[in-house]
Amino acid sequence: MKKQILAIMLGLSLVLSGCSKQSTESMLQEVKKETKELKSGKATMVYLVKNDKIATNNTRGYDVSGDEKFEPLEFALKGKYIRNFYGETKDESYLKDGVYYIKMDDYWFKKKGPTDNRHAYNFKVQSINMRDDTLNLLDNKDNWDISKDGDKVTFKLKKTEELMNKVKEIHNKELKKDPKYSEFEYTVEYVYNTKNKKLDKLFYEIVAATSSSPLRVTTRGTLEDLNKEIKIELPEESKEAKELKEKKE
């Protein structure tokens, strides 16, 4: 009788443990759903253009991080702006209540923000992770290399010719161009927390160059602290910001 009871208890524990374990397909679909529904987070965005024909001072772009929410787009970002021969300057940028504020070289400026949420500092627009065509790749687990570290599972898009061509297609769709690449490297990652069954982090990087240009372009970004409560506060000195004139069409 004791053996029967033990056998029943063992069987029950196995069933329960099986029920609590989440399948790969289930995690991928949860990642897809939560990515589509993201509202905010701590963003890091890097955009660098390097001229391989110039030995030194050959890079321009930006490297910024901070809080950002998507609807409507608002952010508070700090970092650096790189200007080739002119070196690096601190970059402090805010978008709040439809007005864009920027501090460069200790001077504050402001102008009307975008009405369509499109901005160089909009992670949702810049990140290849958040585009529908990329999210659709989550429907097939064979597209992904999977690694586990404690409660965290990382889904990393595989490096195959077929998937590279797909990533190029997605990238070009946003560029609205179809360049011929001499170099194209990509990393697309989603990190999922199996303990709280929540999406934990997004990461992407694309390095691209064409045979018709000496320029190599790197775009990279991370989004963490997903759906955090964000309230953008403007620095007191931003009240002295000078109005930037809009460019005439």
Give the residues covered by each predicted segment.
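Positively charged n-region of N-terminal signal peptides that target proteins for export
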Residues: 1-7
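Subset-of-secretome marker
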Residues: 20-249
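C-terminal motif of bacterial Sec signal peptides marking the signal peptidase cleavage site
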Residues: 15-18
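Nucleotide-cofactor and metal-assisted catalytic machinery
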Residues: 11
